[in-house]
């Protein structure tokens, strides 16, 4: 069973990864509560992911999907705050710590298929200290909807959900849901030929990841 599960996750990475094509989204079906959704999101140790704590979000596929997520500034000519979310090229790079905060203020653990806010917990200058919350911005040149970091208001930054891909492997994906609607889309990888970076963007093919504690 585990071998089949690993094959399933790996097959997601063997599908074409678009570069020049514009994003033509396939809307996901709304997630309904099931028995499995009563299980909290788990890290690679099988421990519950705690609300408001820091974790690494790392590609579930060793050698094929890269490493963890990082906040960078791809435009070196710009003096603006780092706002680009990329997948590290190295399998050994866990990326930057990410704080996962449920929209429900009373939640103590992170539950799948519920709204979350993601923010990078990294050292930055005073001008950029609040420019770490995830959101979605459209890029007219590429036609992509990129995951960006910035001063997003709560209504725009807590529209993400962690969805279960495989229970046996504690593998997950992220979906983005438009505010006030049930329209949800996969967050996947997009290889940017201009910057030669793999960026997070809305995609028909999800970025499948595992969650690592930052104290490992």
UniProtKB/Swiss-Prot annotation:
Chief location: other
Family: Belongs to the protease inhibitor I3 (leguminous Kunitz-type inhibitor) family.
Protein name: Sporamin B
Physiological role: Major tuberous root protein.
Cellular compartment(s): Vacuole
Record GO terms (molecular function): endopeptidase inhibitor activity; nutrient reservoir activity
Tissue specificity: Accumulates specifically in tuberous roots and tubers upon tuberization. Sporamin accounts 60 to 80% of the total soluble protein of the organ.
GO CC aspect terms: vacuole
Keywords of the record: Signal, Storage protein, Vacuole
């Amino acid at each position: 069973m585990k071998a089949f599960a690993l094959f399933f996750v790996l097959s997601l990475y063997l599908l074409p990864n678009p570069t020049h094509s514009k994003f033509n989204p396939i809307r996901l079906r709304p997630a309904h509560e099931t028995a499995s959704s009563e299980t909290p999101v788990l890290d690679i140790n099988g421990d519950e992911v705690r609300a408001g704590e820091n974790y690494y979000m790392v590609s579930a596929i060793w050698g094929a999907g890269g490493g963890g997520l990082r906040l960078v500034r791809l435009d070196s000519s710009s003096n603006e705050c780092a706002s680009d979310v990329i997948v590290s090229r190295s399998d050994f790079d866990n990326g930057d710590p990410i704080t996962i905060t449920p929209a429900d203020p009373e939640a103590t653990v992170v539950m799948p298929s519920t709204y979350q806010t993601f923010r990078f917990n990294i050292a930055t200058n005073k001008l950029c200290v609040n420019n770490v919350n995830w959101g979605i911005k459209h890029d007219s040149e590429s036609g992509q909807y990129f995951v960006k970091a910035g001063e997003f208001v709560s209504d725009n930054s807590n529209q993400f959900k962690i969805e279960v891909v495989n229970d046996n492997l504690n593998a997950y994906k992220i979906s983005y849901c438009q505010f006030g609607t049930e329209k949800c889309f996969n967050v996947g990888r997009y290889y940017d030929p201009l910057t030669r970076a793999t960026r997070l963007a809305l995609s028909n093919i999800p970025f499948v990841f595992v969650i690592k504690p930052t104290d490992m």
